[in-house]
Amino acid sequence: MSDRHGSGRAARPFLYVVVCAAGVAEDVGELIDAARERGWEAGVIATPVAMGGFFDVADVEARTGRPVRSAWRTPGDPRPFPAPDAVVVAPATFNTVNKWAAGLADTLAVATLCEATGLGVPVAVLPCVADALAPHPAYGESLDRLRGMGVRFGDPYTGEAGEGGGRPGFGWERALDLLERP
């Protein structure tokens, strides 16, 4: 991709990781490490609520070597990330999926997703939506709309305890697998 943002190209393909406010976000470092192992450089954009303690911002910044973004920059500020070669949304919440599908770009995270789909940048999503919210008609319609735009989805994850009482693991690397398929 050309450098639409004027900040120079990364030496490796650049991955935007959009993090939403779900409990599993605390382990987003696993995705960053897996992406680096697969040859990606990453930058993280978080929803404002996710910035409120859902993950360790300092740890993520140390892993990526870049600031975590959640607010728009002012016009004179340099762009902190190069243009994305791909985007991963993990965990993707009910709220973010619905706002994105409706084009409600009221946060940097959702605006970034709207731009990425508009520009044809590959996007992989790992939904993390509660069982009580997943059947809502708006959510199903949003998934259909985003799939129609070429967005790739992993299996849904609720975070609910299984029969044995433990939570199943969140498949962070599945997002990277989704980006590798044609």
List where the protein language model places each region:
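A cross-family phosphate/adenosyl-ligand binding-site feature
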Residues: 1-182
